[in-house]
UniProtKB/Swiss-Prot annotation:
It catalyses: a 1,2-diacyl-sn-glycero-3-phospho-L-serine + H(+) = a 1,2-diacyl-sn-glycero-3-phosphoethanolamine + CO2. One of its GO terms (biological process) is phosphatidylethanolamine biosynthetic process. Heterodimer of a large membrane-associated beta subunit and a small pyruvoyl-containing alpha subunit. Catalyzes the formation of phosphatidylethanolamine (PtdEtn) from phosphatidylserine (PtdSer). Belongs to the phosphatidylserine decarboxylase family. PSD-A subfamily. The active site is at S197 (schiff-base intermediate with substrate). GO terms for cellular component: plasma membrane. The gene is psd. It comes from Bacteroides thetaiotaomicron (strain ATCC 29148 / DSM 2079 / JCM 5827 / CCUG 10774 / NCTC 10582 / VPI-5482 / E50). This is Phosphatidylserine decarboxylase proenzyme. Binds 1 pyruvoyl group covalently per subunit.
Length: 228
């Protein structure tokens, strides 16, 4: 499969198309009812301003910038999401590896792009979705107790990297495009978290970390680690 074959060159993410159209029509009907239904126009103006603000926030949330990494991807791990680095630590990974791994976590706020990218080139070895809670995504337990999707990728060098999409207090739906056996590449979308919240990347111990705590990341652009 070509490197850019699955890359969707769109400005609004496909996961947001139906939501944005439905929201636009609903807000239009509400504002039309207020405008034509009451003589006093003050409530209409207040609701109209609020409607525009809410809709612009939703458009911002579902935006889908076209990004190409543009550099050599060998042994490179890129940020799978826009956001802020909230965890860099060794942890026990008990779903797939059952050993110690280096975990780098990116928290996405409501104003971040919520499309997720593959962090490495490789072949998809495992995809799993787990139902769970919707506690705040920055809490340590969120990684194992919240609703989440796990994708394991084996790089061309034979290194396995686990990426976990995690829903938060607001997020209620995780979308994952990965399928076992497919090849995946940096520059391609791995999925989308609707109104949520965190992505964890599990790497082998000894991996060179290229980011710091609190650093802001740009999905598919920021190099977060280099594999040995």
């Amino acid at each position: 499969m070509g490197r850019l074959k699955k890359l969707k060159k769109i400005r609004i993410h496909r996961e947001g198309t139906h939501i944005l159209w439905a929201s636009f029509l609903l807000l239009l009907l509400i504002n039309a009812a207020l405008y034509w239904g009451i003589d006093c126009k003050i409530p209409f103006y207040v609701v109209a301003v609020a409607s525009i603000a809410v809709y612009l926030l939703m458009v911002n949330f579902f935006r889908c910038p076209i990004r190409l990494f543009g550099k050599d991807t060998e042994k490179i791990v890129v940020a799978p999401a826009d956001g802020k680095i909230v965890v860099i630590e060794e942890v026990d990974e008990n779903e797939y590896f059952h050993d110690r791994r280096l975990m780098i976590s990116i928290f996405m706020s409501i104003v971040n792009v919520h499309a997720n990218w593959y962090p490495v080139d490789g072949t998809i070895k495992k995809v799993a979705h787990h139902n769970g809670n919707f506690m705040k995504a920055w809490l340590p337990k969120a990684s194992t107790e919240n609703e989440r999707s796990t994708v394991v990728i084996e790089t061309p060098e034979g290194v396995e990297v686990l990426t976990r999409q995690i829903a938060g207090a607001v997020a209620r739906r995780i979308v994952t495009y990965a399928e076992v056996g497919e090849e995946c590449y940096i520059d391609e979308h791995m999925g989308f978290i609707k109104f949520g919240s965190r992505v964890d990347v599990y790497l082998p111990l000894g991996t060179e970390v290229c980011v710091n705590m609190g650093q802001l990341t740009t999905g598919n652009q920021t190099v977060i680690a280099k594999l040995k």
